[in-house]
Each structure stands twice: as C-alpha cells, then as structure tokens.
Regions:
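Short C-terminal tail/terminal secondary-structure segment
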Residues: 2-9, 153, 232, 243-254
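Substrate-binding pocket helix/loop in short-chain dehydrogenase/reductase
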Residues: 104-105, 112-117, 199, 212
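Active-site loop-to-helix junction immediately N-terminal to the catalytic Tyr of the SDR YXXXK motif
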Residues: 108, 154-162, 174
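C-terminal substrate-recognition "lid" of short-chain dehydrogenase/reductases
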Residues: 125-128, 220-249
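Active-site helix of classical SDR
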Residues: 128, 164, 172
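Alpha-helical segment proximal to the catalytic Tyr-Lys
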Residues: 133, 177-181, 240
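Residue(s) in the substrate-gating loop at a strand-loop-helix junction
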Residues: 148
Length: 254
C-alpha cells in the first residue's frame, strides 16, 4: 500500500464510506483504516465488501462492512444506523458510491434516468441528511461528496451520469450553507479519470491512454491513492476552514 501521512485527528473517528467495496471506495476504506479510524462502509457487492473487511481486520479498528443497495433509501438508512450502533456517532461521511455506466440519449427512459440519479445523486443527499444529526450533536464534522470532471469536459455517451455529477456540486454548496452554523463542512472531491480495475477493464484502451496524455498536464496515470490523499485532507482537521468548495484531482485536465 502507498505510504500516507498520518493525521491524529482521524484516529478513533467514525468514518462512513459509501460504495466502499471496490475501486476508489476500497482504497478509501484501506486508507482510513490505516489512519486508525473506525471505518464503516456500505456497498451492494457483498462478496467484495466482506473480503475487504476480512483483509483489513487486523488494523487498530477492524472495519465494518454492511451490504446495502444505496438506491433503496430505507436500506441506506439501515446501513448507516448499523455503522452508528457499532462504532458510535459518525464524524466523517465520504459519499463515494456511483456508477458511470455508458448510455445514449436515444436509449434513455424515465426509468433509466431515475436509476442513474438514484445511484449517483439521491443517496448523497439522504446520507448527508442522516449523519448531520450526529455531527450537530458533536459540534462539527466533515461531509465529502464525490463529483466528476466528466461534465466539465463535456464528455458524451453518459448524459444522465454527467447531469447527476454536475448536480452534486450544487448540492454541496447548498448543504454547506445549511450545515455551516453547526460547524459541519461540506465539500466536493472531483476526480479525473482514475485507473481503477473497472476502468482498466472496460474503457482504458490505447485510444483512452492517448486522450489522457493529451488532456492531463501531469503525464502519469491518476490512481485511487491520489483521490484518497485528498479525502484524508478534507476529512481531517487540516481542512477546518474549507467548505462549499470543489477540490479537483485530475492531473490538470480541467
């Protein structure tokens, strides 16, 4: 695992991560467990989630995995409550879960629109709403919503996904205003094209690598660890006066 700086403000804090079984989410889980945080993570992939939790069980706090379909808000609420009951009030929320499935305008139906909004936007609002009560009682907390550079780059082939991800940044600003009086920070972490196993398997072709080389200022591949580093900053006391902001980690593409 890549070595990260240690931040004592995260040790023993309860951190909730959505979509934590694979990809960027799995890296987030591993990174925050290494910080000594109490990590609970939710994902629909029960097999991958359980395997990750077992692999990291020897840490300062063994992580808790809860299998949940986050498009089902009742299931999301139950999952959050399970983490709360196991570890205590939630201090940090990382709203990572998403699905960038490609789709065409002409193939989009009202049902597929709703499905894409549910997996990319809706759960972020309701998770933030749920944990805000914990944070208010504690005198503060950090919520990190996950966006995407896709809409900034005018990417085609996934219009509902890009719409949802653009909306995430509006949600962040609204929640930052509403939660600010309670010392709850809300920011958006905006990844570029991150080389997860899924991206490498499905879309990172030779042409895709050429696009990266042309688009990014920094000529190296963007990895999940780069996103986790920014998440650590936004979750920790080091970002105590940062809220309502977009933190882009994309190698200089936007």
């Amino acid at each position: 695992m890549t070595t990260f700086a240690y931040d004592p403000s995260l040790r023993d804090s309860t951190v909730l991560i959505t979509g934590g079984a694979t990809g960027i989410g799995a890296c987030l889980v591993e990174t925050f467990v290494a910080q000594g945080a109490r990590v609970g993570f939710l994902d629909i992939d029960a097999g991958a989630g359980a395997a990750l939790a077992q692999r990291l069980a020897g840490g300062h706090h063994a992580p808790l995995f809860v299998s949940a379909d986050l498009t089902d808000i009742a299931a999301l609420t139950r999952g959050i409550d399970a983490v709360r009951q196991h570890f205590g009030p939630i201090a940090v929320l990382l709203n990572n879960a998403a699905n960038d499935q490609r789709h065409k305008v002409e193939d989009t139906t009202p049902e597929s629109w709703d499905d894409a909004m549910a997996v990319n936007l809706k759960h972020q609002f309701f998770a933030a709403k749920d944990v805000a009560a914990d944070m208010r009682q504690a005198g503060g907390g950090s919520i990190v919503n996950f966006g995407s550079v896709s809409w900034m780059l005018k990417m085609g082939g996934m219009p509902v996904y890009t719409t949802a991800k653009a909306a995430v940044q509006g949600l962040t600003r609204s929640l930052a205003r509403d939660f600010g009086p309670f010392n709850i920070r809300v920011n958006t972490l905006v990844p570029g094209w991150v080389m997860t196993d899924k991206q490498l398997r499905l879309w990172v072709t030779d042409a895709g690598r050429a696009d990266i080389a042309r688009g990014q200022c920094l000529q190296q591949l963007l990895m999940p660890e780069h996103i986790a580093r920014m998440a650590l900053f936004l979750a920790s006391d080091d970002s105590a006066m940062c809220t309502a902001q977009d933190f882009v980690v994309d190698g200089g593409w936007v």
